[in-house]
């Protein structure tokens, strides 16, 4: 998993993949769009959004 731009449905799919059964919380205030769509994010950064 390389650092990459993840936007919209791609971002949601990546969260499902990374978080699995733990699930995740998606709140725009958390800055995930800025971190992963406007910029690039890593697997480690995505894990911060898992429950």
UniProtKB/Swiss-Prot annotation:
| A GO CC term attached to the entry | extracellular space
- InterPro entries, per the entry: Insulin (IPR004825), Insulin-like (IPR016179), Insulin-like_sf (IPR036438), Insulin_CS (IPR022353), Insulin_family (IPR022352)
Q: Which UniProt keywords apply?
A: Carbohydrate metabolism, Disulfide bond, Glucose metabolism, Hormone, Secreted
Q: Provide the protein's localization.
A: Secreted
What's a single GO MF annotation on this record? hormone activity
Asked if Disulfide bond is a keyword of the record, the answer is yes
Just give the chief location class: secreted
Taxonomically, the superkingdom here is Eukaryota
The answer on whether this UniProt entry bears the keyword Secreted reads yes
GO BP, sorted A to Z: cellular response to oxygen-containing compound; glucose metabolic process
Q: List the disulfide bonds.
A: 7-37, 19-50, 36-41
Q: Which SMART domains match?
A: IlGF
Q: How does it assemble?
A: Heterodimer of a B chain and an A chain linked by two disulfide bonds.
Protein family (similarity comment): Belongs to the insulin family.
What task does this protein carry out? Answer: Insulin decreases blood glucose concentration. It increases cell permeability to monosaccharides, amino acids and fatty acids. It accelerates glycolysis, the pentose phosphate cycle, and glycogen synthesis in liver.
Q: What is this protein called?
A: Insulin
The organism's taxonomic lineage, starting at the top:
Eukaryota, Metazoa, Chordata, Craniata, Vertebrata
């Amino acid at each position: 998993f390389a650092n990459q731009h993840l936007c919209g449905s791609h971002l949601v799919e990546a969260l499902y993949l990374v978080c699995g059964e733990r699930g995740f919380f998606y709140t725009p205030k958390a800055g995930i769009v800025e971190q992963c769509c406007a910029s690039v994010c890593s697997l480690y950064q995505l894990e911060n959004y898992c429950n």
